[in-house]
Amino acid sequence: MLRWITAGESHGRALVAVVEGMVAGVHVTSADIADQLARRRLGYGRGARMTFERDAVTVLSGIRHGSTLGGPIAIEIGNTEWPKWETVMAADPVDPAELADVARNAPLTRPRPGHADYAGMLKYGFDDARPVLERASARETAARVAAGTVARAFLRQALGVEVLSHVISIGASAPYEGPPPRAEDLPAIDASPVRAYDKAAEADMIAQIEAAKKDGDTLGGVVEAVALGLPVGLGSFTSGDHRLDSQLAAAVMGIQAIKGVEIGDGFQTARRRGSRAHDEMYPGPDGVVRSTNRAGGLEGGMTNGQPLRVRAAMKPISTVPRALATVDLATGDEAVAIHQRSDVCAVPAAGVVVETMVALVLARAALEKFGGDSLAETQRNIAAYQRSVADREAPAARVSG
């Protein structure tokens, strides 16, 4: 089974991603990973740290000459600011006298509302929020994006599947409700300052960010990930944890600052009558076709051959420049929350991270369905399955013809 895990702190020496269970023979390079990490840095409203926190990628294991080996893949993303933090974030004990005059080591005792600071300090017995915020930081998503690059490569090479995303809305901007983008639209989306597919909405999104920045505030928004080219039958109806929608929702909700997930038309479907909530089927030249995709490519926990659509709602960033009211846990007094440098809006970047988690879940589902130790073996298994599906859909194709 495909598994992944990340390690590292925001200001630590490095982040590390480990991917286990990937078949041999998938072509992926450190340049591919760096390209995806660069996409994660995109977006109007990002903070100054995006200009100096470079992502230095080193593949430690599992890939040789640009091809996966079948063993665990370890990827390191170095922190170019490490020399500034080496004493504060050292793994081994440091002489207190050496730390006494280091401003970066000052205890952070005023938790930020909306962040992991408060609950993390109480749960783990910390007198300082530093150990919490270092791991809870969205900087960790860089390691996920690195892992997801391997999953993307597998999906593309094994199944011809492409995963992309775009921003639906930022703040109070009008949400985009048109058709989802296609694979060829991704370069234009990434070229947009807010990663918007709808150019008409771009100016409104930018204006929302500018207004929030002027007011010393932050903004959230909604992104949509789309997976194109999926076969019928990934996932299962047999048990709740085997349903692909439950796996996707869990993976996307696990991203920092994501507060809601919907598949397809999601909550809109709940307001419709059944006759207008589902996707009717008709005979087509290659089998069954549909005129709508309200289900977002999933029915009964399984892919149905339609484009997969997953939307995620991101809350405004918890580190608010004008600072929110809190309690100093060292004294019990009223206080204003600590302020770390941060973004005004990270919604465009969140779309890339949502893509990543969708790709990882889909790659796992595909490997569970088709198996194999090498890409070539998996491709043979996929081809046999697709022939079987085509045979079962042949009656509909004959009727259409």
Swiss-Prot record:
Pfam family, one: Chorismate_synt
Enzyme Commission designation: 4.2.3.5
Protein family per UniProt: Belongs to the chorismate synthase family.
Keywords: Amino-acid biosynthesis, Aromatic amino acid biosynthesis, FAD, Flavoprotein, FMN, Lyase, NADP
Transmembrane helix found in the keyword field: no
NCBIfam families xrefs: aroC, PRK05382.1
Reaction it catalyzes: 5-O-(1-carboxyvinyl)-3-phosphoshikimate = chorismate + phosphate
Pathway the protein takes part in: Metabolic intermediate biosynthesis; chorismate biosynthesis; chorismate from D-erythrose 4-phosphate and phosphoenolpyruvate: step 7/7
Lineage of source species: Bacteria, Bacillati, Actinomycetota, Actinomycetes, Mycobacteriales
Other known facts: Was identified as a high-confidence drug target.
GO terms, biological process: amino acid biosynthetic process; aromatic amino acid family biosynthetic process; chorismate biosynthetic process
InterPro entries the UniProt entry points to: Chorismate_synth (IPR000453), Chorismate_synth_AroC_sf (IPR035904), Chorismate_synthase_CS (IPR020541)
Protein name (record): Chorismate synthase
GO cellular component: cytosol
Record note on cofactor: Reduced FMN (FMNH(2)).
Keyword Nucleotide-binding in record: no
Residues where FMN binds: R135, A136, S137, Q256, A257, G300, K315, P316, I317, S318, T319, R341
Cofactor(s) the protein requires to work: FMNH2
Subunit structure: Homotetramer: dimer of dimers.
Source organism superkingdom: Bacteria
GO molecular function: chorismate synthase activity; FMN binding; NAD binding; oxidoreductase activity, acting on NAD(P)H
Gene: aroC
